[in-house]
């Protein structure tokens, strides 16, 4: 009996030893992609279901899912909505967790037809896998008699991309509308509009006057909401084209021109002939009656003054660029409601609530010009990157706070000195990014990045190891789709402690963004599951498995790792 127990213990120990012998070098805490994202499919005639079982702590990117038919015709693929995930470098993305099922309608499939499915995912711990590609064999399916053939195109997560978000909350549109009400083209008109809404009657109950004013505002809001829905619907049809850099640059130029019109460089409004026709239509309506007042409000929404044309055009263009219909209609409704609130107050309480007209109204108009100038920066930031985007924000901040400071010098009210100090301080703070760019900053004296030598194949790696001349070697795997790789560049490799620790190390880097055949071969040769992965080789060109790094490390942790690795 004792001999059997001893034999069993020996067998278990030997099994453990053999398992350790055949473990991958630098055992990783992360599982292979096939275990992180278990892919399966099932076809029943025209109905095909693609499914992924996503391991806990991992997720798939919605926009990275691509479905391409070969010798087959499929209907447009509608990917289900995911959950929002945000990171520093790529902003908001939709992801899938736990399980994903994608129904695909196969209109027709010839003999030997296949479906190529590409997907990509990451781990919450900051480890991303290269794009995975699976080939799904399709059963032969005859086309339905009434089916309309469609071209075989690639269906991706981008085709059903959710509507983009506006750079501001829709509630800000309410505040913008209220602000526009105090411009020189709008505020002086409110007493006149109030009299027209009431039908020239001076003695109406407060409730009746409030009801008529509310109906007028709702008529105006209906027009603006319809404009917002039309703009969003039009933008949704051309969503991909509206994200093209040339289109973004064109929109930025248009927004800049709209802002210049708010600065008084030129006047932007509807043609006078069209305004006259709309005014005549409005005058035919009977004031004091709910129906007539509603129509008057709806027509008033189309009559844009020089102060309202530019802000309205800017909001419409950005809504079209976002393609979000719900947000588009809601934003314009709140904008109209904001413009109508002062009118409702004037109608109920009279002119005594209105501030006196003066130069301050022109200043309000100019301030909204700066608000519109923020939109080109939002758009251009997608093209020129974070660094230049920060400089544009800096330039806009200096211009706005500088203008506000100069304007405040004309005021004689008590307490304006405090406001002037605050504005001047804000301008000085805003200029810092421009100052660092123009004259350099102390932090820029240290090299921002390590000096890597690029390699792309196994042969190039072997050659680089042979040329290391007895020095240790570090090989970093990088890809544009790897968020943690960018974090390594920005936070870890730029640290002086890390750079000092790597002073005598030969630095190699393999960029596997394309994930082509040679990239796959290199990853397979070195048994790299995903990114970021950093390998270390000794002076003889042999990898140090225990020193392998998978996943992100901050500068302090990575520096300690470099000191602890085997020589």
UniProtKB/Swiss-Prot annotation:
Residues 435-567 form the Thioredoxin domain. The chain crosses the membrane at residues 166-186, 210-230, 246-266, 299-319, 326-346, 360-380, 387-407, 418-438. Residues 1-19 form the signal peptide. The keyword Transmembrane applies. One of its GO terms (biological process) is cytochrome complex assembly. One of its GO terms (cellular component) is plasma membrane. PROSITE patterns: THIOREDOXIN_1, THIOREDOXIN_2. GO terms for molecular function: electron transfer activity; protein-disulfide reductase [NAD(P)H] activity. InterPro entries: Cyt_c_assmbl_TM_dom, DsbD_gamma, DsbDN, DsbDN_sf, Thiol_diS_interchange_DbsD, Thioredoxin-like_fold, Thioredoxin-like_sf, Thioredoxin_CS. It catalyses: [protein]-dithiol + NAD(+) = [protein]-disulfide + NADH + H(+); [protein]-dithiol + NADP(+) = [protein]-disulfide + NADPH + H(+). It comes from the Bacteria. Disulfide bonds join 122-128, 185-307, 482-485. Its EC number is 1.8.1.8. Keywords: Cell inner membrane, Cell membrane, Cytochrome c-type biogenesis, Disulfide bond, Electron transport, Membrane, NAD, Oxidoreductase, Redox-active center, Signal, Transmembrane, Transmembrane helix, Transport. It is a multi-pass membrane protein. This is Thiol:disulfide interchange protein DsbD. Belongs to the thioredoxin family. DsbD subfamily. Required to facilitate the formation of correct disulfide bonds in some periplasmic proteins and for the assembly of the periplasmic c-type cytochromes. Acts by transferring electrons from cytoplasmic thioredoxin to the periplasm. This transfer involves a cascade of disulfide bond formation and reduction steps. It comes from Salmonella choleraesuis (strain SC-B67). PANTHER family: THIOL:DISULFIDE INTERCHANGE PROTEIN DSBD (PTHR32234:SF0). The lineage of its organism: Bacteria, Pseudomonadati, Pseudomonadota, Gammaproteobacteria, Enterobacterales. It is found in: Cell inner membrane.
